[in-house]
């Protein structure tokens, strides 16, 4: 039967996505202009829900295409303007540069990171200790590198482990070329492979939560942290100190949760590394050590020095995050002899699709701001006073961040709170406390779903997710114990007065100074 033109168009539309998903996107595109004509506010919220739906269906179709079509239509029908979208991207240029350059920069340090994490896996046999190592090291790295960068590193490590095992288990040597995405090799033991997949899922989830535990602590840990720090006019050290009354107890609670879920093997955790797989990875490690040349050792040494520069540059805020990432690319490639254009291009493959998706997301933010979708929630939260106001903002941010990306939740909230400060509705000291509540509220409960955490979405849409059978639902289930513990400990730190009391102590000991409202007027308020 010949294929009709309409059938060919539908087949090509969104490629191999399920037919029901294609029809859903088409129906969204038809419905939105009609609803917008009658009620722009409802149409705006409908668009937000539809965009969240495309994020939730990330394994069916990468969200850039369906989300991008919704964003293009939103601009075309007047929900927002191209200039407002451009303004949002300009206001968040540091985040874009971070994604483009920092993630690519870490690509050229993956030999060192693969070396370190391979040693962790092969030298430490206790699954509980390995899990704690991955969680804590991810948290430490996220405090300096940005959570997205760290999860990109862990993904690289996991793909490395998986491909090594898959290659050898398929009857090939370490040096042979091999397609590790195909399971059609008769030598593979299905039970062993499933156990290894479960082991890698565990480590990736512990590492992912670790990035949230460390990422909330510093201004470079998460994209929205940079935005919040810029609005509040805080530098690296001040940001970390102000967050500490909430982030320190949350960190220890998170590490304890990691220990408990592994110890009691609940929520899909406790998967052991099969002995045969451990032997393959140990043999690979020994093979690499034996065949490591002077040139290879120099490369590892160079990458270690660049790592020191990276941490020092970020901690001392010597340049913007993206520019430090660019310096990492230049130093790593120059001193490791990578001068081929195609070799350079591979470093950008992982980050650029997500960067494009982030630009689409900023178009949705522009709609939220232009149609004032969050205004009722903000005004309701501001109607409370003192410590209760902090708790309300934490919970309101947390609930929204669970279902929508925490970057735009944090961006919208900090802008609205800053506007309230400039309008005289709140004091500067209360603004600073609210900024802490917003930052922790967007970072901690958002581990609930991949929609909230950019690093989790990055993991869900990465090459490793289908290999280890890490689906959206499975991520939500495995994140659940962390979601409950981190959210509750965070809200208790605010509710019981620890945030206000410790902040006052920091003022008294002059670790912090009181800012004036005037200090924030120089920074750009995104979306206004």
From Swiss-Prot:
It comes from the Bacteria. It catalyses: 2 Na(+)(in) + 3 H(+)(out) = 2 Na(+)(out) + 3 H(+)(in). It is a multi-pass membrane protein. GO terms for cellular component: plasma membrane. GO terms for molecular function: sodium:proton antiporter activity. The chain crosses the membrane at residues 25-47, 66-86, 97-117, 130-164, 241-261, 304-324, 351-371, 390-410, 448-468, 476-496. InterPro entries: Na+/H+_antiporter_NhaB (IPR004671). Its main location: membrane. It is found in: Cell inner membrane. Keywords: Antiport, Cell inner membrane, Cell membrane, Ion transport, Membrane, Sodium, Sodium transport, Transmembrane, Transmembrane helix, Transport. Belongs to the NhaB Na(+)/H(+) (TC 2.A.34) antiporter family. PANTHER family: NA(+)_H(+) ANTIPORTER NHAB, TRANSPORTER ARSB-RELATED. Na(+)/H(+) antiporter that extrudes sodium in exchange for external protons. This is Na(+)/H(+) antiporter NhaB. It comes from Shewanella halifaxensis (strain HAW-EB4).
């Amino acid at each position: 039967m010949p294929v009709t033109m309409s059938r060919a168009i539908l087949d090509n539309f969104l490629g191999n996505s399920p037919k029901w998903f294609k029809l859903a996107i088409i129906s969204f595109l038809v419905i939105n202009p009609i609803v917008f004509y009658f009620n722009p506010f409802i149409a705006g919220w409908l668009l937000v829900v539809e965009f969240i739906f495309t994020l939730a269906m990330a394994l069916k179709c990468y969200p850039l295409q369906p989300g991008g079509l919704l964003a293009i239509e939103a601009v075309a029908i007047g929900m927002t303007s191209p200039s407002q979208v451009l303004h949002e991207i300009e206001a968040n240029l540091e985040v874009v540069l971070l994604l483009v350059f920092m993630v690519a920069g870490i690509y050229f340090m993956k030999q060192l990171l693969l070396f370190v994490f391979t040693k962790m896996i092969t030298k430490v046999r206790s699954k509980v200790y390995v899990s704690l190592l991955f969680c804590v090291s991810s948290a430490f790295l996220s405090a300096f590198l940005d959570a997205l960068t760290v999860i990109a590193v862990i993904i690289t490590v996991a793909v490395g482990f998986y491909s090594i095992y898959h290659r050898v288990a398929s009857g090939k040597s370490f040096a042979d070329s091999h397609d590790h995405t195909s399971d059609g090799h008769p030598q593979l033991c299905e039970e062993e492979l499933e156990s290894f997949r479960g082991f890698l899922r565990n480590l990736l989830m512990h590492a992912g939560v670790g990035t949230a535990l460390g990422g909330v602590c510093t201004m470079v840990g998460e994209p929205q942290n940079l935005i919040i720090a810029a609005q509040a006019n805080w530098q690296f050290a001040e940001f970390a100190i102000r967050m500490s009354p909430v982030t320190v107890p949350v960190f220890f609670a998170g590490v304890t949760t990691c220990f408990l879920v592994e110890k009691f093997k609940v929520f899909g955790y406790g998967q052991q590394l099969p002995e045969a797989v451990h032997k393959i990875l140990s043999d690979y490690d020994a093979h690499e050590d034996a065949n490591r040349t002077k040139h290879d050792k120099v490369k590892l040494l160079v990458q270690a020095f660049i790592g020191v520069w990276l941490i020092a540059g970020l901690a001392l805020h010597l340049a913007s995050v993206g520019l430090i990432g660019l310096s990492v690319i230049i130093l790593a490639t120059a001193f490791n002899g990578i001068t081929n254009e195609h070799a350079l291009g591979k470093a950008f493959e992982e980050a650029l699709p997500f960067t494009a998706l982030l630009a689409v997301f900023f178009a949705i933010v522009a709609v939220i701001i232009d149609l004032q979708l969050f205004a009722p929630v903000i005004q309701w939260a501001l109607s409370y006073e003192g410590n209760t106001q902090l708790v309300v903002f934490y919970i309101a941010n947390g609930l929204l961040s669970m279902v929508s990306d925490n970057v735009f939740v944090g961006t919208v909230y900090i802008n609205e709170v800053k506007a309230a400060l400039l309008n005289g509705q709140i004091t500067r000291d209360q603004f600073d406390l609210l900024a802490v509540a917003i930052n922790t509220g967007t970072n901690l409960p958002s581990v609930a779903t991949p929609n909230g955490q950019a690093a989790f979405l990055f993991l869900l849409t990465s090459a490793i997710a289908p290999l280890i059978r890490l689906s959206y639902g499975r991520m939500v289930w495995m994140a659940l114990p962390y979601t409950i513990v981190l959210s509750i400990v965070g809200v208790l730190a605010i509710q019981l007065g620890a945030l206000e009391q410790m902040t006052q102590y920091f003022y008294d000991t002059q670790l912090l100074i009181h800012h004036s409202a005037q200090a924030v007027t120089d920074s750009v308020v995104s979306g206004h």
